[in-house]
Amino acid sequence: MTDKEKRLQRQSRIRNFSIIAHIDHGKSTLADRILEKTAAITQREMKEQLLDSMDLERERGITIKLNSVQLKYQAKDGEEYIFHLIDTPGHVDFTYEVSRSLAACEGAILVVDAAQGIEAQTLANVYLALDNDLEILPVINKIDLPSAEPERVRQEVEDVIGLDASEAVLASAKAGIGIEEILEQIVEKVPAPSGDPEAPLQALIFDSLYDAYRGVVAYIRVVQGTVKAGQKIKMMATGKEFEVTEVGVFTPKAVPADELTVGDVGFLTAAIKNVGDTRVGDTITSAENPAPEALPGYRKLNPMVYCGLYPIDTAKYNDLREALEKLELNDSALQYEAETSQALGFGFRCGFLGMLHMEIIQERIEREFNIDLITTAPSVIYDVYMTDGEKIVVDNPSNMPDPQKIDRVEEPFVKATMMVPNDFVGAVMELCQGKRGQFIDMQYLDANRVSIVYEIPLAEIVYEFFDQLKSNTKGYASFDYELIGYKPSKLVKMDIMLNGEKIDALSFIVHRDYAYERGKVIVEKLKELIPRQQFEVPVQAAIGTKIVARSTIKAMRKNVLAKCYGGDISRKRKLLEKQKEGKRRMKQVGSVEVPQEAFMAVLKMDDSGPKS
């Protein structure tokens, strides 16, 4: 048998698939069971959420990064099949990670909770899978729960998504029920990868990480051709050339292999020192015999939310730059640029996909790189049209131009789809109205679940909307959003002044109708949070030159009369005058320390009055 025939025979037994599911529908547990069933790991190595290798993932019980693993499975037809399972995140902020992993597959297992049914993010991920022409295998999980209704959910999969669910596997990943059926369905229904092992090499980089000893490790899916150690490769986007030092697969541990050929999912090292040379979504080809064109990569994702990250210890500015460079390597949705603030010194303006993404990056910097951060209030990108016809893009409230020169301001709107139980429809609609939302559509999925669609300004969703939605529905709602474009709004910039000085990091953009209430609440909040000084400190909220709210932090007072026992009033008056004069001088030169909580207070407006 020739090399080519061997490769083609092996290729016909490869199955690449990923698991898509809403958070908590049992995706990581199902992955654990599949690993056990195919004996990829011993019982001794087994631990919950095995593929979620980041501590943060295990703590929060969510998958953030995609992971891949190669498994061997002895099917009932007597053949040994090679499975590549690519694990995907389920949260709306990590849709990009999902689209990356789906591009490396031919099939997807759709896990739906037998008690909860289809959720908003399940839908979003299914549409991504359909865009990539994947074979979708529905699995109804958690059938051992007392509240499970597998038949209702099966009907829901057919009605809401339009998939034929008559052969959907009823399973319980926790109890290990139905796992074998799932594996057999993968063998029967997921197509083998198509491609020619002899053609010029085309391999898609779907992730990468930096290893101190081996340089950059690229995770690849080979689409055409073959790659082995010693071969010269070329990155199609950057044109850089390297010599491959090692190729291999994950089982889940990294194991070297002789070669990777069509359909294989594995890793490649080539002494690549510079993180920027392996862009996720780039195509690797052979330097001697390059492919005529690159593979269609990924959509470039634009950040939706911006905020400033500043090191508390300014000496760590360069460490923060390095941390962001390393995180950006395998999180291409993260963007950053240097910025300075009068209040906080040197830092970076970073762009994220959403609030969870922002929190996770922040936590990863603090944990993995040991840098304590101050973060400023998140903001979205506004389009500002000037009276002279010029258009300015503003992602930082302190860059907002002079209101006299502004013709109009447009802000991004999203179409938010919420799936909620019937009883909470009123509460959810009230929440959306309070967030300047506009009602679009409402559909009853079944007797007790409703899908509600609103158009809401992104700035309203950015902070705590998801938490408020969950608390208004006792945790039952699910939520997904997509950007629909920009619309004009009556927006103004509000400055916060301490002791007559503007604090640039506390500025924010607010809807004019809510400006007064919001200013009042923030001023009161800052009054509580900023420690008292030796002198009186006025806290003011201003729009342009107009002060809309004011409060005063009272001065701390030392009792200068303590050492006067009885005696002459003029002596006491002299001491009091001297104290008063000292306070006056101090007020002129004194600066006010602003604690981190004060920056977050600008955001947390949920416990008082209307919100902007």
Curated annotation (Swiss-Prot):
| SUPFAM superfamilies per UniProt | EF-G C-terminal domain-like, P-loop containing nucleoside triphosphate hydrolases, Translation proteins
- Where is this gene product found? Cell membrane
Q: Does the keyword Membrane apply?
A: yes
Identify one Pfam family in the record: EFG_C
Q: Which reaction does it catalyse?
A: GTP + H2O = GDP + phosphate + H(+)
Residues holding GTP: 24-29, 141-144
Function (record text):
Required for accurate and efficient protein synthesis under certain stress conditions. May act as a fidelity factor of the translation reaction, by catalyzing a one-codon backward translocation of tRNAs on improperly translocated ribosomes. Back-translocation proceeds from a post-translocation (POST) complex to a pre-translocation (PRE) complex, thus giving elongation factor G a second chance to translocate the tRNAs correctly. Binds to ribosomes in a GTP-dependent manner.
What NCBIfam families does the entry give?
lepA, small_GTP
- Spell out the protein name for this chain: Elongation factor 4
Name of the gene: lepA
